[in-house]
């Protein structure tokens, strides 16, 4: 094959690799969600201890992150002072622990399909909190789109066959804490030039989460676990569940590193629809036509929001390229003038 053929082969390999990363991420994300539901649901494995499950994940993930960074040196740790850690990482760790605790708790009360529908509110929460914290500028067009997403989720909630108020409150709380965490990452870390990939995030944040979760665990779940004499720690169940949770973080690292965050958003939409289909067909959760209509409306709003973000990123990149081109042209002109001035000086000396 010629040069063009070799180039085509390279492009095809890159596309296939990207699709492979997407498929791995969807599979692992799907597996972790269904596995957590299986463990926590009283009708399945019947182990309704979301704080303990989250702590097991955090202990396992932080241990492996330390091994990957300190022993195998797969990624370099970020240089961070104690003051920066306390001011920036600790608040993010607190929010992350609350988000995981509440989202895992919701699996006890709500179906997998309905939880995915409620998660469609994430862009609404991120944008609203971003505006409140002056990280995002208020735009009436964007806010109208956010309202359409909220309206779609409200319709889906109205059509939910097994609506549980407490479960909905837990999931909405998880969305609010997660959205605040995402905005604070931009304010406290990204703005300071600190970029954490999923592995370094676990290295710094997971131990912090473990500490924050320990205090509610002592009062909420530990007394019940002590009374449950029949309970024995199943290393196969909790071990494989923790491995899946850590593998998911590695998959995020690969997906964002080799493709883009937008690809992950699109893959997330595919995963949500697959989970809804799985919840309905395998777990036998009830999915009503009103559920699907409401979620479909919210889905269109989220898709439009992602499209607008992509266009904004493209415009920003194009502007950067124009600025770089102008700077290069100005540099060339300056070099030419300096060369001309040097030539004139040489002529005068001669």
UniProtKB/Swiss-Prot annotation:
Record membrane topology: Multi-pass membrane protein
Cystines in this chain: none
Recorded GO CC terms: endosome; Golgi apparatus; Golgi trans cisterna; plasma membrane; trans-Golgi network
Cross-referenced InterPro entries: Sugar_P_trans_dom (IPR004853), TPT_transporter (IPR050186)
Domain of life: Eukaryota
Similarity remark: Belongs to the TPT transporter family. TPT (TC 2.A.7.9) subfamily.
Keyword Protease attached: no
Entries under Pfam families matching the protein: TPT
TM regions (residue ranges): 15-35, 49-69, 89-109, 112-132, 146-166, 168-188, 205-225, 235-255, 263-283, 286-306
UniProt domain EamA: residue ranges: 38-155
PANTHER family, alphabetized: SOLUTE CARRIER FAMILY 35
Keywords: Membrane, Sugar transport, Transmembrane, Transmembrane helix, Transport
Localisation per UniProt entry: Membrane
Keyword field contains Cell wall biogenesis/degradation: no
Main location: membrane
Lineage: Eukaryota, Viridiplantae, Streptophyta, Embryophyta, Tracheophyta
Organism: Arabidopsis thaliana (Mouse-ear cress)
Region: Disordered, residue numbers: 324-350
Protein name: Probable sugar phosphate/phosphate translocator At4g32390
């Amino acid at each position: 094959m010629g040069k063009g053929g070799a180039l085509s082969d390279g492009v095809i390999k890159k596309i296939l690799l990207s699709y492979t990363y997407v498929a791995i991420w969807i599979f692992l994300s799907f597996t972790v969600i269904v596995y957590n539901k299986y463990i926590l649901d009283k009708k399945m494995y019947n182990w309704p201890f979301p704080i303990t499950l989250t702590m097991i994940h955090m202990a396992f993930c932080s241990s492996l992150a330390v091994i990957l960074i300190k022993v195998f040196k797969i990624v370099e740790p970020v240089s961070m002072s104690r003051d920066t850690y306390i001011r920036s990482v600790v608040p993010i760790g607190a929010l992350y622990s609350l988000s995981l605790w509440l989202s895992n708790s919701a699996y006890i009360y709500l179906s997998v399909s309905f939880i995915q529908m409620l998660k469609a509110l994430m862009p609404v929460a991120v944008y609203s909190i971003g505006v409140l914290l002056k990280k995002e500028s208020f735009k009436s067009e964007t806010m109208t789109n956010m309202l359409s997403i909220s309206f779609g989720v409200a319709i889906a909630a109205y059509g939910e066959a097994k609506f549980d108020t407490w479960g909905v409150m837990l999931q909405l709380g998880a969305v609010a804490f997660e959205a605040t965490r995402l905005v604070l990452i931009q304010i406290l870390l990204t703005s300071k030039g600190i970029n954490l990939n999923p592995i370094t995030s676990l290295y710094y944040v997971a131990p912090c989460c473990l500490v924050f979760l320990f205090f509610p665990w002592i009062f909420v779940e530990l007394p019940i676990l002590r009374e449950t004499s029949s309970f024995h720690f199943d290393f196969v169940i909790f071990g494989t569940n923790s491995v899946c949770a850590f593998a998911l973080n590695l998959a995020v690292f690969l997906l964002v590193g080799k493709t883009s965050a937008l690809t992950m958003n699109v893959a997330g939409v595919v995963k949500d629809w697959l989970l809804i289909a799985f919840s309905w067909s395998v777990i036998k959760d009830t999915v009503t036509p009103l559920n699907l209509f409401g979620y479909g409306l919210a889905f269109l709003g989220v898709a439009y929001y992602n499209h607008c973000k992509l266009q904004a990123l493209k415009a920003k990149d194009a502007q950067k390229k124009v600025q770089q081109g102008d700077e290069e042209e100005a540099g060339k002109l300056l070099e030419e003038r300096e060369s001309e001035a040097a030539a004139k000086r040489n002529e005068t000396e001669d």
